[in-house]
Amino acid sequence: MKARRSTRMFRSIVVTVLVSSGMLRDVTAQSSTGRGPAPSLVAPKSTASAPRADGFLRRWLVLEPVRTKGQLTESAVQAAVKTDVFADPLTVLPRDRDTVTVDGSQLTWHAVDTTEYNVNLYHFAYALGKPTSNVLFWAIAVVNSPREITDVRLAIGSNAASVWWVNGKEVIALYNDRQTVIDDGVSRRLTLHKGRNIVRAAIVNAGGATDFCARFLEPAYKPITDLTVTLANQ
């Protein structure tokens, strides 16, 4: 009996200390709004992001996950990305914190910089308290080129399936369950205009980890680094 009373008294003291210090309140607030920041994703702090020597695009505008069936075949993925779950998914150019309504739920666009070569969508969704399985992610990068560059290729990797567009034209896609591999898919030759180019991606995940990476390659497959990535309002 004395042991039980001592245990209850100890718990009471711990709760009192947590409440008085604000720690319990902070933990509760965090769990109700999300799970804390994603380990490899940060809010942009500069007006432009330049690729490193490896050429990967590290600034993206990502929409919170849209629920889907999570089927990864070519026909299923193409059907998912061409369904207008919100207005003009293949032409919209949103700003950070813009929202769309999908099946009665409000989803938000988030500007993110990745500290790695890839964008970890599992971390992105988990940190926001959003689903990570049977979902579709939309991502947009505004890529600025100081010159017109011909015969370049968009090289991508994704987990799992993905479809990619450059300046409104579909250029590459990956299907079925897969891990992200650098340059797993390489587009046909295309032209980057001088000035602004819009790269758009749709990534479908059935379950587990999910991420993507992308970069532009010169004809000799050397990464292009004299680009900048900005947001729509920059």
Predicted regions and their residues:
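N-terminal secretory signal peptides that target proteins for export/translocation
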Residues: M1-M9
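Bacterial N-terminal signal peptides
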Residues: R11-R25
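Accessory carbohydrate-binding/adhesion or oligomerization-edge regions at the termini
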Residues: Q30-H123, A201-Q234
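Extracellular and analogous surface-interaction loops
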Residues: A139-D151, R189-K194
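Beta-strand-rich ligand-recognition modules
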Residues: W165-R215
